[in-house]
């Protein structure tokens, strides 16, 4: 029995030594490029300083039992921790224009089956915060932008973002999950990049919140405090409906029908952008903008750009005594007012 006990003790010691070796790149008290990292009560804390820092977290190549922290985001590990010892991750950057991202190129490790909640926070400055981008596994992260004009890219999974002060942007790309966006202060934008296939998108008011729903993928974006919605529909015969958004914070919706992101050419497919008015008395102006039309006079202005002349813009006034004026739309887009071509 003595021998058995002795062997067990040696095994425990070996595990402890291995854990120490894993964390050997830099001690918890060390600062690398202004960044500290340490585990406390099961939470991996990564903290930036007041300068502009870049941080990436990833799994070790060839050994997914190790989480690495890359201060400088230059591809080298400055801190390493046993994955099994990490039950939550909190990244907090300081002042300055910082970048913090989850690099899941070696595997997913945030919001996975181990329930490892992850929060990525900026500070003052114009920060870039990015969740896992490549893995199919759900990676549900929470983002806190702080002050400054921040860019948050949630990536895969169902994410929650608190954008904070400043004029911030939340980015969504095809294949990602359903996200919750709290715009908070400033003029904030949701940038939604679709796919080069036929898509059906509907924007509706849910009390004071915007519900942005895409049928393909069953994607729901739930937003509050977001003033601008940029929808890049891309290729395919798309259908986008903008309902009455009275009560929400959305004042501008931009529908880009170009065939490619940043492109200037229309996609050649017949797209439909439907704008629904209110049951009150509406005064609506529909004006050509050189590549489509702008619809103003409702709670939310709608701008359709890079349209084909065969694309269709139905404007439905609904109930009430309404007035609609059109100008400069000939050859830009097919405008229908209450079903009548104008």
Question: What residue spans do the PLM features occupy?
Answer:
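Initiator methionine at the very start of the polypeptide chain
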Residues: 1-2, 28
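Bacterial N-terminal signal peptides that target proteins for export
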Residues: 3-13
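Bacterial N-terminal signal peptides
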Residues: 14-21
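Acidic, glycine-rich low-complexity segments
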Residues: 27-342
